[in-house]
């Protein structure tokens, strides 16, 4: 399986702007710029897209873990926060914090915690950042 996305940029870093599109066209000419990345401008940015990808990936992995354990979720809601920091050699993503709230009829806390930890470790986006960014998880069974 292979998925693609493209980015187009015009101009310099601070005064330029660009657009991002995905193969599925869910994102089509979605605007991004220095302002959207560093100053709360209108549009998206790479870190926001990574957060969305990680939240989605982890949530699907958790659903698979719970379903495999015989306790399919009623609902899962995950937020991912990506931290971008300036380092000596440039900017780096240093941490990703996942917060998930789960309604899982029949699941006990210990089994849920194990499923969440396994999902965090097994999610392909988590694997991508392993060793490069601290990934933390707050998993709540509600």
Tell me the role of every PLM-derived stretch.
Residues 1-52, 59-142:
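Extended beta-strand/beta-hairpin segments
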